[in-house]
Amino acid sequence: MTSIPIFESVSRFLPPANEDVQFWWKVTGRHMACMMHEAGYPEYRQVECLLFHRFKVIPCLGPRPHSDTPWYKSRVGGGAADGCPINYSWRFGTIERKPHIRNFIEPLGALTKTPADPLNEVATKALLQDYSMTLPNVDLEAFWTFAPHYRPRIIEKEDMEKLAGASLLVGAEMSPDSRTIDIKAYMYPRVPSQTSQLLTTILPQAMRDTYGEDVCLDSLNFVHDFMTNDPQGSQLALTGTTGIDCCKLQETRVKIYVITRNTSFDHIAAIMTLGGRRSISGELLGQLKALWYELKGAPAELPSSEQLPVQTKPDGSRNPIVVPFYFDIQPRLALPDVKAYIDVSTSPVSDLAAAKAVVRHLEQHGSGQNPKAYLNVLKDITPVEELETQKGALAFYSVAVKKNELDITSYFNPQVYKRYFAHEVQLNGQRRSVFE
């Protein structure tokens, strides 16, 4: 592991803590320090963000692992994750912008996984309220207005037990040249009927309650029409997941997440361009196609109208491929922005090969500042041999079009549970974790 002087200096002067906090600091605190160091954050910003992580994130991560099985399986990180309540993202920089670091957590508290909090929302709401009192840029007006619309109206005990699970996540973005921490909240409807009503009932009413009865719903209505009437858009399905910025109301964005099972690149391009309504140059679509094929392990000669080859699991069963997107809704804009997610956790391409493909793309097209710093981060968090032979470190790459270039973000996992025994050493006849 690379020595990170700022992490070591901050650690030296932290107050005593219990074993849970010590564990999460040693693991995730060091991960955050490594990311900011490699991304070239100013030293004052590294210290500021590390202190935020130690005192405002780590206390919400719950008990330290005591085996390779999580006591509560968080949905952070999606299908690639191992149940750990935190993961990270690295938004690659541009020529003019350094990389941006984020983490995503599902706060865990005393009531998590108990009948008192079946949706695990108590700790999250308490954390958001704390952020609103300590971070001057955080405004929860939109979140508090949206949240009741997403809460299930469940009366029957059997239904509540069946639908229990995560309903809220929190994201924290730590930009290198800012003095603030930007907070996002993610809501998950637990009842299937809520998801089907999202575009027609829940979101329109939530937006009117938030922004006022005269709010412009053109962007939201476009998404509904696109998913209803467009030949390509009608193949999309709502997941129910909705993200919202916790900032001043006039700056708040609402993100609606969808998936498709059509893996042809022509379909991907049609969604990114909203059926031709958003202009994306042929050059950028060509870059996206090349990246899509490489990350998915598809042959370069595969026609863009064809589906990706079927993938199989080790047991011989099919590994279904879904492609997530989100629509970025802003009342002041007539059309939403679109972002695609490329799931590499189910790809035949190794995590290391996928990471190198993205870095190679950035270098070839003159994007990003020192993109190989990202490889240094991955190799510091996960040994190279595991990146070459195992899956799970990488979850997704997201791709949007910003200022006539591809804006790429990597989402990856600390694998705290999966790797619990990976680096054990034999000591006095006892198996001990490297984290102990």
Curated annotation (Swiss-Prot):
Domain of life from the UniProt record: Eukaryota
Pathway: Secondary metabolite biosynthesis
GO molecular function: prenyltransferase activity
Keywords noted in UniProt: Transferase
GO BP terms, alphabetized: alkaloid metabolic process
Pfam families tied to this protein: Trp_DMAT (PF11991)
Residue runs in coiled coils: none
This enzyme's EC code(s): 2.5.1.-
Family in the record: Belongs to the tryptophan dimethylallyltransferase family.
UniProt cross-references to PANTHER family, sorted A to Z: INDOLE PRENYLTRANSFERASE TDIB-RELATED, PRENYLTRANSFERASE ASQH1-RELATED
Chain's role: Prenyltransferase; part of the gene cluster that mediates the biosynthesis of neosartoricin B, a prenylated anthracenone that probably exhibits T-cell antiproliferative activity, suggestive of a physiological role as an immunosuppressive agent. The non-reducing polyketide synthase nscA probably synthesizes and cyclizes the decaketide backbone. The hydrolase nscB then mediates the product release through hydrolysis followed by spontaneous decarboxylation. The prenyltransferase nscD catalyzes the addition of the dimethylallyl group to the aromatic C5.
Name by which UniProt lists this protein: Prenyltransferase nscD
Annotated gene: nscD
